[in-house]
């Protein structure tokens, strides 16, 4: 860091002699930078501030910066600062996730998804900064001995745009983390409230029991015996009431069973009568026919017997 601050100081003193014209910063960037470098001083915000300071130094495109851009030193420094920022951000996110345990699973998943998206955007834009510098180094080396004013102007424009994107990413990430932290605080308060609701009745019961034991200890033996007798009597009455209720339930069930049996018996009787009527309708014609045949047979037999018993006439000569 001492080397970094020394480089910044040298850049500031030599700014007037730089070959490249310094880019004009928008008026709103100081406020955004203040937000990006962290109002609460979280480790990830401090790490992002170090990345930010290094980017501002690179953005000056002073002679020293141009010399170092021809070597991989700048990109290595940016890589280190990027890794440090993302590491601190992941650690802070893990800490908030532990505090979010009492929150509903759906809410926790939604907040985690939004935070991961904001974190990914910040990482992608930081990676874009490094890629632009690598591309610039390659183009400068390819144009060795030629004018690189156009390349430097293009790089300065790209860095300004990327800087604005990084500011927006940092601001969005701070807002997401604030929502995440608020959810963790709300979940913790809800968990404490739930514990208080569970323990409240138990504490009240303990207090009542303690008061009862204290009052019983101060009463004479006769009063305690009388109170015990009343409690036993109340208990017996309660048991008797429960028994009567149970008997009433059994009676109702027996009555229901009896009604069902009577209904089934009536149905069986009706079915038997219907079956009897059906049998009668089947066999009645047959019986009548047999009776007719029998009557005819009897008449024939009687006629035959009458004919055989008639007197034979005697011939007198």
From Swiss-Prot:
The gene is APOE. Keywords: Chylomicron, Endosome, Extracellular matrix, Glycoprotein, HDL, Heparin-binding, Lipid transport, Lipid-binding, Oxidation, Phosphoprotein, Repeat, Secreted, Signal, Transport, VLDL. The modification Methionine sulfoxide is found at residue 143. It comes from Macaca fascicularis. It is found in: Secreted; Secreted, Extracellular space; Secreted, Extracellular space, Extracellular matrix; Extracellular vesicle. One of its GO terms (cellular component) is chylomicron. This is Apolipoprotein E. It comes from the Eukaryota. Residues 158-168 are annotated as: LDL and other lipoprotein receptors binding. Sequence repeats lie at residues 80-101, 102-123, 124-145, 146-167, 168-189, 190-211, 212-233, 234-255.
């Amino acid at each position: 860091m001492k080397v970094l601050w020394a480089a910044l100081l040298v850049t500031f003193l030599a700014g007037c002699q730089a070959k490249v014209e310094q880019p004009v910063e928008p008026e709103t960037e100081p406020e955004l930078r203040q937000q990006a470098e962290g109002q609460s001083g979280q480790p990830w915000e401090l790490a992002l501030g170090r990345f930010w300071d290094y980017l501002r130094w690179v953005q000056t495109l002073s002679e020293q910066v141009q010399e170092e851009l021809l070597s991989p030193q700048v990109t290595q420094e940016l890589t280190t600062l990027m890794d440090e920022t993302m590491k601190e951000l992941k650690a802070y996110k893990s800490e908030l996730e532990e505090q979010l345990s009492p929150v509903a699973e759906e809410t926790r998943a939604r907040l985690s998804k939004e935070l991961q998206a904001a974190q990914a955007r910040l990482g992608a834009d930081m990676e874009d900064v490094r890629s632009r510098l690598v591309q610039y180094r390659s183009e400068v080396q390819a144009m060795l001995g030629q004018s690189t004013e156009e390349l430097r102007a293009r790089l300065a424009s790209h860095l300004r745009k990327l800087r604005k994107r990084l500011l927006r990413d940092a601001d969005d990430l701070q807002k997401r983390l604030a929502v995440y932290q608020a959810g963790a605080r709300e979940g913790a308060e809800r968990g404490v409230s739930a514990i208080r609701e569970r323990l409240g009745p138990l504490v009240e019961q303990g207090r009542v029991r303690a008061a009862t034991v204290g009052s019983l200890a101060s009463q004479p033996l006769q009063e305690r015996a009388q109170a015990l007798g009343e409690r036993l009597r109340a208990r017996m009455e309660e048991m008797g009431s429960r028994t009567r209720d149970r008997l009433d339930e059994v009676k109702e069930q027996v009555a229901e069973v009896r009604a069902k049996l009577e209904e089934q018996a009536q149905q069986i009787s009706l079915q038997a009568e219907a079956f009897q009527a059906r049998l009668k309708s089947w066999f009645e014609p047959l019986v009548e026919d047999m009776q007719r045949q029998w009557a005819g047979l009897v008449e024939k037999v009687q006629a035959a017997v009458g004919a055989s018993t008639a007197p034979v006439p005697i011939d007198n000569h």
